[in-house]
Amino acid sequence: MAQVPILRPGEVVRVFQSFGWGIARQRGSHIIMTKPTNIATLSIPDHPQVARGTPRALIGRAGLTVDEFLSALK
């Protein structure tokens, strides 16, 4: 399995937007994303860098694979 690099919040948001997720709101230091066809919400920390494990957890919650996420990142 491929390793997820350390990313900036904007990069994570951009990748999820390419899969149909949209920014619902931003409260404090987190960006909340939703998708009309998915009941889950994604909470992306708006810090200088997102820890390596956070995108991996969000990928699973969004119903994606790591490979799909990484290919959209390029």
Descriptions of predicted regions:
Residues M1-K74:
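Basic nucleic-acid-binding interfaces
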